[in-house]
Amino acid sequence: MVVEQIEVIEHRIIEEGRRPSGGPLLGNTVPFSTIRESRESYEQRADGTIHDRRYEVTGERDVSREPSFLHTSANYGQHIETSPPPVQRYNVSGATNSSFLNTSGDSRVSYPGADRSNDTTVINNYGYDIHEVRTDDGGARIIETHGSGPLRETSRIEHVEETITRPSAMRSSSAAAQRSSSNIFTVPAPAAHVSYRQEFASDNESLARKDSYRAMQSSWDGDEKKMTSTLNSRRFPPQSQTSLVSRETDQHSGKKIGCLKKIRTFYQGVRYAFENSEYTPELLRSLCCILLLLLLLLFLMFIIFNAIFNRYAVSEFLLYPPVCEECRRKNPALVSAALPSSVFVHFFSKHQAHFELRGNQPFKSNSFTAVDFNTGYVAYADHSLTDANGKHFTCFLMPLDRSAIDSIDQLSEAVSESSYEIQSTFGWQEFYQFDPEKIEPMTAKQKFTEEIDDCEGAQWYLLRQTVHARDASCSECYDFCLPDWAVVRKEKYEDESTLGVRRLNCFRLYVPQWSNFRVETDIGGGHWKYPLSSESTKRDKNGEWVHWIPTTNAQGFSRSRKSINNATLV
């Protein structure tokens, strides 16, 4: 452990003389004897740096450096010894005067020939104190004068020097026992690092207050000294050691403050600043700049989060079909302005995109489509093929045509460039070029990266493309047309693309669950009407049923089937 030593050296140099204020014998006057006295005290402490530097922050009065605690004047605490008084005392002018010295401070002017028989010699006391403190970081020197005036009839010099040294280890006993009796007559320069010492027998009475105060400060236990040495090695700024609240208490109290309390304190501070501040033009301009920066930051955050989450958001569009000339030819009473169909596009994952269709004419029902761009397959679930619990009992599988939609990035770009209302000028034709073929559910599940929840436990059909037209051999089959989604150009020579329906993939399928329902033609003619209306099988953008009506509770259908000639359907 490194022990630091503080040496407090006090030097007092007293020059005492008595001279008359004037007279012819001024040049023959001999001053009396001079006594020099020095006091020295040693104290050893490991935490001397903190004790000596605490006064710089707390503003305490250091009794070891304050001259008012040690003496009140130049004569305080000194024993003035004089040689045996002569028979006669002379003033400067040579006149004899046997009167005693007057130290009352009365100053009188002497002139030749004046009657000074009853006059006393005036002695003016004058002195100064020099305080020097040298540390590793620097030092300070303070000179304080006191007395009633300049030295005139008497001279007195008092020199107090306090030197603080901090050796790396304790001085040896032999070095500490060395004594020096040389007199010091010079004042040390501020820039030079020189210590002037006079070592005599220490006077415990004059430094009793200082020693007791330092003893009180050094009465800590071993743990406190170790902690102080650690803090001193970190070179913290000087702090007072006399405070009742330690640094550890402040640190622990700061850690206990919660985040909510810190926010509340910060809010209260800002509110107090706004309530008590003076609203000058400069302050208002600063507040406006801060507000603009906050708005800009919010706008940038909105753009960033929109770019991140928009890919997995749900987009809704209205699809207007082209004018159906064939439908108008078959049914002249049909209104030419068809109602639009709505579609919800949901980017389910980085590999799948889902389409939720609320179909109107020429669509015969609502449907769900899942496109897996990783495996290259498409799953269809017609909402008319559901049971009383809303579960699909039939799903369809077909390969993805890359010429229609190449990737999910292309689809995302088309969705971002599409307007809310999409007017189609071509497409939407019915193509009966597919034949359904039953496959195992396990085989169908292997065709997709993520499992299709709507087709869980359903019967799968693979739609194989053929070259023949609609098969008329099945008299009890229903016609199904599913949308073939594609990315198309908005105009012929424009680069912007949009979402569209390239065609309708149609086929005929026998549904055994509908064998007990009566067959009716739809409003367009040429197709059988599904037992479950499309108004009862709509779903929202989250995939939840809207106005769901189970098949068993559907009104307007009877349990008996009515035979209809197949020729009337052609």
Swiss-Prot record:
Phylogenetic placement of the source organism: Eukaryota, Metazoa, Ecdysozoa, Nematoda, Chromadorea
Protein name listed in UniProt: BRICHOS domain-containing protein C09F5.1
Span of domain BRICHOS: 369-461
Regions of compositional bias (Polar residues) in chain numbering: 93-107, 228-246
Keyword Cytoplasm annotated: no
Keywords in alphabetical order: Disulfide bond, Membrane, Transmembrane, Transmembrane helix
Principal location class: membrane
Subcellular compartments: Membrane
This protein's record includes keyword Disulfide bond: yes
Gene Ontology CC terms: membrane
Region (Disordered) residue spans: 93-116, 218-248
Topology Cytoplasmic: residue spans: 1-288
Coiled-coil features, chain-numbered ranges: none
Domain of life: Eukaryota
Membrane-spanning parts: 289-309
Positions on the Extracellular side per record topology: 310-570
Species the sequence originates in: Caenorhabditis elegans
Membrane topology field: Single-pass membrane protein
Bridged cysteine pairs (disulfide): C395-C455
